[in-house]
């Protein structure tokens, strides 16, 4: 079983989400019981909606619980160095256009592309791992190959 890197903050968010989902369980069970009391289950939209909600809730709980043992919780304040690893904030320059982009490389459970946080497992994340400032990388993106120059590599600590 491989490990999944995650920050302490990210792990705390996932544990809080799990607690919230578990807290929701009794409400869903109550909604199912109330809908069942309404009679004919074949045409009872409330019952079917509550059962569907229960299924999605249980699937999410099971998914999170199955991932927790795989997490490798990383103290972001201990990260550093020249090489790009989990937790690095990297500024890239598109060799063709000259456009710069800045990404922070995190685990898959913390990635948020809109915030510039990419997964260590993404095409860009995979291409950057182990590289240093000044290197060039080719990313096999869905729209084709993109060549980037690595402008800077820094470690900022916790990401929120």
Swiss-Prot record:
PROSITE patterns: GREAB_1 (PS00829), GREAB_2 (PS00830). This is Transcription elongation factor GreA. Pfam families: GreA_GreB (PF01272), GreA_GreB_N (PF03449). NCBIfam families: greA, PRK00226.1-2, PRK00226.1-4, PRK00226.1-5. Belongs to the GreA/GreB family. Transmembrane segments: none annotated. InterPro entries: GreA/GreB_C_sf (IPR036953), TF_GreA/GreB_CS (IPR018151), Tscrpt_elong_fac_GreA (IPR006359), Tscrpt_elong_fac_GreA/B (IPR028624), Tscrpt_elong_fac_GreA/B_C (IPR001437), Tscrpt_elong_fac_GreA/B_fam (IPR023459), Tscrpt_elong_fac_GreA/B_N (IPR022691), Tscrpt_elong_fac_GreA/B_N_sf (IPR036805). Keywords: Coiled coil, DNA-binding, Transcription, Transcription regulation. PANTHER family: TRANSCRIPTION ELONGATION FACTOR GREA. Necessary for efficient RNA polymerase transcription elongation past template-encoded arresting sites. The arresting sites in DNA have the property of trapping a certain fraction of elongating RNA polymerases that pass through, resulting in locked ternary complexes. Cleavage of the nascent transcript by cleavage factors such as GreA or GreB allows the resumption of elongation from the new 3'terminus. GreA releases sequences of 2 to 3 nucleotides. GO terms for biological process: DNA-templated transcription elongation; regulation of DNA-templated transcription elongation. Residues 14-38 form a coiled coil. One of its GO terms (molecular function) is RNA polymerase binding. The keyword Iron-sulfur does not apply.
